């Protein structure tokens, strides 16, 4: 079984180095490692050239983009390139995700044991930066419920006590996708920039085959803890807009109309309770809802990296 790796990086060279090392140390080696460099300015480009020049049994591929396309644009480019490469499964991850050394070995054994099953993807346990605490927010089950609601509950700690459990929503942290399924539906929504690109993609993949979480596959996610008091920043726009766009694309209109009321209400409550610069938060949420109704995606002309209420 041939496994490829797609990593997207932007200005986190120290973490990228750790990530690359974690793939090269796998007990079952990947066929290739493809790194999408989202126009980093911290020496990433130069380091990757040096990394590539040190030849190993693993093929090393670099895709340097001429602008920062966000995580969604980076994963789109990476997965698009993976379709032309020699692998059967593609592992996707951010540059701050470090799989344990036996992650690919466990994945390979599971896939070979269940080769008669219709699998779209498998994924593992995401651990917080302490290496022991499970971050349940990376796996979820999405379904419709009463009163035209869309429920998207995260996985629960008890789920990880099982040998496996089925989901239909994953993050691009510690996920391995069946390449055959990648060819049967659109790739990542590249115009999302950040947030919900992985959820939207995984939900479509779940319509083509099972998505299974295998807790013994473990990935440490070296991501900082976000304080609720920091909710009012540029990323909030994309979280609200893309949540609604995902619903608009994948569910009936009645659900979209209901969620255009429910989703902004929940976020406005969060801004009211925890956020600073509340008026900017409310305005950003309203702008996100308006654009979702128009089907407008892409990088917003105001809410983009570097924006803050005080600028």
Regions found by a protein language model. Name each.
Residues 142-168:
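Short, flexible, basic/aromatic active-site loop/helix in glycosyltransferases
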Residues 21-31:
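Short, acidic, metal-binding catalytic loop of nucleotide-sugar glycosyltransferases
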Residues 64-85:
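Glycine-rich, basic loop-to-helix element that forms the pyrophosphate-binding segment
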